[in-house]
Amino acid sequence: DFKNVDPNGGTVDIEYGLVEKGASQVELQGGYGGNSFIGSIGVSFNNFSLKGLKDKKAWKPVPMGDGQSLSLRLQANRFYRVYSFSLADPWFGGEQPVQFSTSFSHTKQFRYNFFTGSVNKEQFVSITGASIGLAKRLRVPDDYFTLSQSLSYQYYNLQNYFTGLFTFGQGKSNNVSYTVALSRNNTFTNPIFPLGGSEFVLSARFSLPYSLWNGVDYGSLGELPEFQDSNGDPDQSKIDQEKYKWLEFYKIKFKGSWYTRLFDKLVLRTHAEFGFLGAYNNDRGVIPFDRFFLGGDGMSQYAMDGREMISMRGYPNQSLSSQNGSTIYNKFSLELRYPITLKPAASIFGLTFIESGQGFDKFRDYNPFNSKRSMGVGLRIFMPAFGLLGIDFGYGLDSINDNDLNPNGWETHFVIGQNF
């Protein structure tokens, strides 16, 4: 509609009538894994409105229009269940682009006998977690920087469930931590296939240093009667339960990618990442939670200890870290990309890569030049309805076992959602 036409001033007000476009997604998946069928159902509302909850007329089927994101998801099989909820508001306060986010999740895994197929629901491990965070776009040094902060809590409960990750199978652990991250993203044109720019994130996660004020001498726990077995020897299970009642740690991570356009649409992606998990108190040691597991496709597989999966093509999953996980790792990669099509309905591009990486148990063992190498080719397909899908064929140039001189050989990796 045209309003306030001013022939003398040469101005006119144009009023557009807008209709909300549906941006919601429903996820229904089913599959077979771990000798059991697994199903998931989820719903995401990407233009949700909290203000409209009280307005009965706004429920069509849910209140929409404020750009908030609401997600609900359930995944389950015979012995594994995950419930999750998240809410994000990109314009918290309404005046500046400050993002507020909150989430809640509950995971429970029962004892499962893979030989008989029986499930014992009296034996289980569960994790209940919640977080709240704020992220703000910065203007200094430039407009591409974002500062984010979050506070999170996880409650671990083991009921007669020995995972092999800890010396105890009966006990509880609490994890209260604060995370601060500085990120910069100036990738331009297509976010699925950047032709230039860079993106990086530097983050630090801290727990409280409980050992500074709780008065516990963790190095002498084995000398106390309550932490000894019937023979008077130190009971490591009881000692670890005391050590990990409240988790104490700090975690530093860096991840960065640079995109260089060589010619036409041939792009070189240079990528580097690093992570370190440390302890405040040497007598308490590094926690068995939140460790790094390097190798393979990087997809989580019933991870009940907060472990962080790091992809490394050309090698089996988690094969470049010890059984208990790494406390420090690094990874470097070079990737040549060329698009087949970049249409809105589907973006497809091929790639070839070389990369190296390695996980280490202790900081004193860290050597960035002692890395496993790989090379290979891959394909990526992005469709709005399905997200990012892909496949990589990687050739491990080194052996997983340092005493073996033969290369690991070919590995096939499937990509669902995540980037390498």
Segments (PLM) and residue ranges:
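Hydrophobic alpha-helical membrane-association signature
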Residues: A130, Y250-I252, N330, S371, ...
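Generic long, charged, amphipathic alpha-helical segments
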Residues: A346-T352, N367
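Short Gly/Pro-enriched loop/turn and capping motifs at secondary-structure junctions
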Residues: T341, G357-G359, P384-F386, G396-I400
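C-terminal outer-membrane beta-barrel translocator/porin domains of Gram-negative envelope proteins
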Residues: P7-G10, I14, S24-N35, S44, ...
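Hydrophobic alpha-helical bundle architecture
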Residues: E335-K343, Y366-N367, R380
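Strand-loop-strand
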Residues: K362, P368-M383, L389, N401
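Gram-negative/organellar outer-membrane beta-barrel architecture
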Residues: D1-F193, S198-E199, I310, G325, ...
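Secondary-structure transition into beta-strands, especially the periplasmic turns and strand N-termini
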Residues: L138-F145, T260-L268, K343-A345, G387
